[in-house]
């Protein structure tokens, strides 16, 4: 199938699993972002399944327990890894963006949040934000139900830490609640997108050549030739 690739603002969406995926829960977030001419990336559900299985084995590492549980979850994860490899290969072979394997995802939050933080989406949410930033999706909407304490810790609470590590990260947490107006939610997202669009256009406008440089003078440091 012919594909026309044009520069677009790339936006990743993370958050509490229901609000993240459900158009009813997030006021048609994907449709809204696409209406703003964005390329939208929702990390897949496979990672959450692997995360749940991984946590069972991690509990044995942190707190002890039956070795059979650890062995069983490791075997299950190995099977999931084989399924994941086939999925990622199908995506990349077709020319689509594919995330890294789960084994790499587990390493990303280390030094930022403990793998023992597994309330709700836990460390997975933080890891997904880091992976999105590293993959070029530095504009991120963190969708959460109003008053969701786990999300305030592993999502909203990690934003400053991620920004310290990746200054280009443009993350906005959005609370979804029946009492929250859709207009306010969309206006906050539009503010984030305004920053993203400025950055998208910046390389075109940056470092124009002077008349002297065009004649043959030496370009200044940082100038585009």
Model-identified regions with their sequence ranges:
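An N-terminal assembly and electron-transfer interface module characteristic of large anaerobic redox
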Residues: 1-225
């Amino acid at each position: 199938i012919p594909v026309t690739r044009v520069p677009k603002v790339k936006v990743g969406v993370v958050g509490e699993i229901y609000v993240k995926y459900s158009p009813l829960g997030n006021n048609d977030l994907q449709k809204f972002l696409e209406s703003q001419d964005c390329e939208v990336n929702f990390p897949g559900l496979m990672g959450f399944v692997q995360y749940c299985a991984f946590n069972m084995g991690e509990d044995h590492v942190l707190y002890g327990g039956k070795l059979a549980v650890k062995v069983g979850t490791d075997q299950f994860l190995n099977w999931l890894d084989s399924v994941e490899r086939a999925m990622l290969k199908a995506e990349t072979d077709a020319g689509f963006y594919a995330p890294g394997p789960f084994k790499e995802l587990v390493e990303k939050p280390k030094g930022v949040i403990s793998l023992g933080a597994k309330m709700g989406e836990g460390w997975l949410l933080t890891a997904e934000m880091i992976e999105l930033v590293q993959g070029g999706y530095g504009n991120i909407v963190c969708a959460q139900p109003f008053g969701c304490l786990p999300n305030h810790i592993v999502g909203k609470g990690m934003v400053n830490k991620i920004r310290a590590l990746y200054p280009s990260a443009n993350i906005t947490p959005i609370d979804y609640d029946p009492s929250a107006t859709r207009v306010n939610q969309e206006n906050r997202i539009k503010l984030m997108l305004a920053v993203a669009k400025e950055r998208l256009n910046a390389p075109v406008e940056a470092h124009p050549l002077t008349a002297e440089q065009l004649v043959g003078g030496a370009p200044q440091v940082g100038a585009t030739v």
